[in-house]
């Protein structure tokens, strides 16, 4: 395996900027996943962190003129990606004893470090006839500011699931890929995932995980399997946003973003499907499905 590229450029959170040290557990998370970090422009079969400027989000004056502007820095730092395969759907991956990101954080905390760290994970669950896949994207912070009391991200993390479903937005773009994939994905470049798909939220004391069931929408499932059919030729940027719906919430900010670079299906790590025990609401984590049968993606601007 080739060595990891140098630390990302300063378009992301400052802890990933040259000259700044990345916390050890985040560095471990970045470099130990089933998909390695690769060069932003030439890398294949891995992930990278695209500059926020490739995404257009609601600007400070959006509700006056509907103008968007290039996104700035991420609120949270990239902490790696997992590409997983299992005999059944993988739920609540951060609760697993073998989750490498939480293992790294726990090791750091046993040394008295990273005690205020917070992890945000998005688990895209991809159904299959015999095998299920999960693409899990991790973001993290050691600073309280991104999730400070009163911030939109704080309201999202600590809010109820009705609020989350109305606000959780994916913005995406095809960086490289066949015309048919560009056409299909381009028609759904911004989507309120909580309204279009079944989303399950798991909140722990120091994390929030969002499991997105791609199979709950026929259109989303068809688009994804179209892309997977030529996945080694596709590079896609995905950004995650809490949608601003009031002037005081503008401008919109990226929670985090990832570029998946010409991934190979065979790169998936095989993991055992575990039964997730039921925990009453308010004890440890919360789980709510946004039940909705739909063949239409909820598009957004």
Question: Which ranges hold each PLM region?
Answer:
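Extended, low-complexity intrinsically disordered regions enriched in serine/proline/glycine/threonine
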Residues: 2-142
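Extended amphipathic alpha-helical regions
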Residues: 104-117, 123-301
């Amino acid at each position: 395996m080739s060595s990891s590229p140098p630390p990302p450029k300063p378009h992301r959170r400052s802890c990933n900027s040259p000259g700044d040290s990345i916390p050890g557990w985040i560095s471990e998370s970045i470099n130990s996943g089933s998909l390695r970090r690769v060069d932003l422009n030439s890398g294949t079969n891995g992930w990278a962190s695209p500059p926020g400027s490739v995404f257009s989000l609601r600007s400070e004056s959006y509700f006056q003129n509907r103008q968007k502007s290039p996104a700035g820095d991420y609120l949270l730092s990239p902490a790696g990606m997992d590409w997983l395969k299992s005999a059944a759907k993988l739920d609540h991956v951060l609760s697993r004893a073998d989750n490498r990101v939480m293992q790294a954080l726990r090791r750091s905390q046993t040394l008295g470090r990273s005690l205020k760290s917070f992890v945000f994970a998005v688990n895209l669950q991809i159904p299959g006839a015999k095998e299920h896949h999960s693409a899990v994207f991790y973001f993290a912070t050691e600073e309280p500011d991104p999730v400070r009391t009163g911030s939109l991200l704080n309201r999202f993390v600590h809010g109820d699931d009705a609020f989350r479903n109305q606000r959780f937005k994916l913005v995406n773009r095809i960086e490289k890929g066949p015309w048919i994939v560009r056409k299909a994905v381009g028609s759904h470049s911004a989507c309120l995932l909580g309204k279009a798909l079944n989303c399950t939220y798991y909140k722990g004391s120091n994390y929030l995980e969002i499991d997105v069931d791609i199979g709950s929408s026929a259109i989303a499932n068809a688009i994804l399997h179209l892309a997977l059919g030529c996945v080694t030729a596709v590079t896609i940027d995905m950004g995650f946003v809490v949608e601003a719906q009031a002037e005081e919430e503008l401008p919109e900010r990226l929670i985090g973003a990832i570029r998946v670079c010409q991934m190979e299906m065979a790169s998936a790590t095989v993991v055992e499907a575990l039964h997730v025990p039921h925990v009453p609401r308010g004890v440890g984590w919360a789980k709510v499905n946004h039940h909705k049968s739909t063949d239409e993606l909820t598009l957004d601007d």
